[in-house]
UniProtKB/Swiss-Prot annotation:
The gene is dusC. InterPro entries: Aldolase_TIM (IPR013785), DUS-like_FMN-bd (IPR035587), DUS_fam (IPR001269), DusC (IPR032886), DusC_C (IPR042270), tRNA_hU_synthase_CS (IPR018517). The keyword Flavoprotein applies. One of its GO terms (molecular function) is flavin adenine dinucleotide binding. This is tRNA-dihydrouridine(16) synthase. Pfam families: Dus. It catalyses: 5,6-dihydrouridine(16) in tRNA + NADP(+) = uridine(16) in tRNA + NADPH + H(+); 5,6-dihydrouridine(16) in tRNA + NAD(+) = uridine(16) in tRNA + NADH + H(+). The keyword NADP applies. Keywords: Flavoprotein, FMN, NADP, Oxidoreductase, RNA-binding, tRNA processing, tRNA-binding.
Amino acid sequence: MRVLLAPMEGVLDSLVRELLTEVNDYDLCITEFVRVVDQLLPVKVFHRICPELQNASRTPSGTLVRVQLLGQFPQWLAENAARAVELGFWGVDLNCGCPSKTVNGSGGGATLLKDPELIYQGAKAMREAVPAHLPVSVKVRLGWDSGEKKFEIADAVQQAGATELVVHGRTKEQGYRAEHIDWQAIGEIRQRLNIPVIANGEIWDWQSAQQCMAISGCDAVMIGRGALNIPNLSRVVKYNEPRMPWPEVVALLQKYTRLEKQGDTGLYHVARIKQWLSYLRKEYDEATELFQHVRVLNNSPDIARAIQAIDIEKL
């Protein structure tokens, strides 16, 4: 079984990847998207999104990292894909699933689901630009406002020469509403294709992962939000281990406050610690109290002191 850590814009950056891969057994991480418009991006853009390039495209604990590109113009997707692998990325991924209004308004992400030909052209251009021994993956949803084009979308990915396909089991319009998850549809796509299909959506624990794999027939899953709810989720999903005890979660947060974000203006940890605690509150009652304590703090040093002051031995 493979477990991949999903790309989550504004959430799963290099520091969080470092922390989560240290306490997990992820097979692969995908970066936050690199927005490609009409130019070959400077090298520094790739290094900013993925400092792991300085470590052979691996996190400090050794987990491989693949870059995700977001755009709609095949030529520029291809040129930036070529640059990415020249810099050392282990393959590239094409974002065809982001539901953000901002992203969709500029023609990227899930907007491509409306026209599978665009997905085909983009993925094909990337495949031709990247050496054959390196993977080119694509992440999609079941469609824009319905699943009517799901097979056309999947066929476009395979015919373009992609190595594997990640399918989020909802349409763009369904967003992240739990009641709409359709693992069966992912399974129908898997049966149709000859390339590996990775299931994504509503995987929160061992039981949901087993159910997803049973229904879809997939032997690989990608997890996103759940990885923040339960920091050791890949081990829960892979080995049926118990969730990380709260004292260990606090220790992880304490380490987080000690990590430095390149280019930080002093507000990084203010937003990110509060954000992570909002996810943790879904699984840990203790996180609610801590969140209430830090939510009124508005600078990184105060946040760090509040987290560091917790005596783990007394928890």
